[in-house]
Amino acid sequence: MRLEIENGLEFVCDPFLNERGKIFFLHAFTGNITNKLSFRTHFKDYSFYGINFPGHGNSVIHNQSELDFNFWIKLVQQFFNKYQLKNVVLFGHSIGGGLAIALTQVLTKEQIKGIILEAPLNPGIRATPPSIISALVPDTNEDFEAVQRALIYNIEQRFGANFKDFCAKQKQKMIQKYAPLKVMLQPEQAEQRLQLIDAAFKRLSYPTLWIHGQEDGIVRYLPSKAYLESLHNPLIELVGLSNTAHTTFFEQPQQFLQLVEQFLNKLNK
């Protein structure tokens, strides 16, 4: 999978001859396309597309308006039109999941085949303490440690005695790279995104697989489940993974891939 850059925007356009289908990946806040390299390798007989949004990966921020959710929606819409993409499965993680849902109200029926959501941003996030949200771009080592515990189940057991050293080093890298994104965490911006996502969820008309860690500390599972149940939409299938937090693919890759494989097989029947 080769990343390209055009006008400061990094993207992947990786078509496969005799494809089984097309997948467009929408990354998480401070994430990037390369987070799903092994996913792309597993589904090598699918064409794979994605954008690193401004401030992510090697994509440049020309001005702050490029961090607006609606700007990201327009970028994807332009990409779909440029490459004449049709029958695409949108796959979004966290804010990328919310973006996938919002796109269902902008892209055409011809362009979307189905949706895969990994711990998607949804109105259930209102139950998450504001201190966790604001720390997604951390100010202190303690902020960073709290977010890591919310992201990955039992992360301290994974790292053992190295956990605090890991956090101290990574926090500094995080601040250097992602400080410009802190504006996206402002309550007004966050609420505008949620209202847009909520409206799109209420009109969702595509088969959707929603995979969510039951120990997620960023977008909490039970409030998200309650929100989903309030929609009464039989097209959305929710799968909660135990002993898993916000990074379900990273934490439970085999189970995640199996669920996605089953979903894609259903779509292709």
Curated annotation (Swiss-Prot):
Keywords: Hydrolase, Serine esterase. Disulfide bonds: none annotated. InterPro entries: AB_hydrolase_fold (IPR029058), AB_hydrolase_sf (IPR050266), Hydrolase_4 (IPR022742). It is an enzyme of class 3 (hydrolase). One of its GO terms (molecular function) is carboxylic ester hydrolase activity. PANTHER family: HYDROLASE, PUTATIVE (AFU_ORTHOLOGUE AFUA_2G14860)-RELATED, MONOACYLGLYCEROL LIPASE. Belongs to the lipase/esterase LIP3/BchO family. This is Putative esterase/lipase 1. It comes from Mycoplasma pneumoniae (strain ATCC 29342 / M129 / Subtype 1) (Mycoplasmoides pneumoniae). The lineage of its organism: Bacteria, Bacillati, Mycoplasmatota, Mycoplasmoidales, Mycoplasmoidaceae.
